[in-house]
């Protein structure tokens, strides 16, 4: 019951400037109905938040999420466990910290224990020491920014049909190692991924098409060849 309480109560939704910019770009490329919704966030934020919360990928752009990934109890089917353990994968929103996420989980655990008549002392919520973690990366500059505009030009040169907007990357990447030395860290992949291709990332038979690969290489060639424009 504690696990269900935590998983069912993610953080409060918050629209960052980056998310607003993403939705603004979507508005310009959507049908009339979605254009009206995304162009009037001052009115439709509650509706948009509800829609985004219903999808795992977009929910993590909006707020801190908790996904139950492991349960551990008895080592045998006929043995009562002296203790049980659960692990959550937590995606911390850019406007919160790891401590915020842990504190929320602890508070929810206490609430459920008290509601169930169980002493909160029987439940411990802590960060798994064996798993490295980092704070959410800062949002890189994107408004009237030379580096972001350069990336935009490179993308448009290879993918003229594509829209371009900042995006909240909700998974951990090695790019976080550069945050200490540079504020312009953009988590961008120059290859075109369909929903099907994204589902294959880190999965069995992960792959991309040959044409997708060739076009993606063209982006990186253009990106490196014109870096002098930033000097």
Question: At which residue positions do the language-model features occur?
Answer:
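Basic phosphate/pyrophosphate-binding loop/patch that engages nucleotide-derived ligands
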Residues: 1
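An extended, acidic, His-containing surface patch that forms the Zn2+-binding/catalytic region
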Residues: 4, 11-75, 82, 94, ...
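Hydrophobic core residues within well-ordered beta-strands of beta-rich domains
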Residues: 84-86
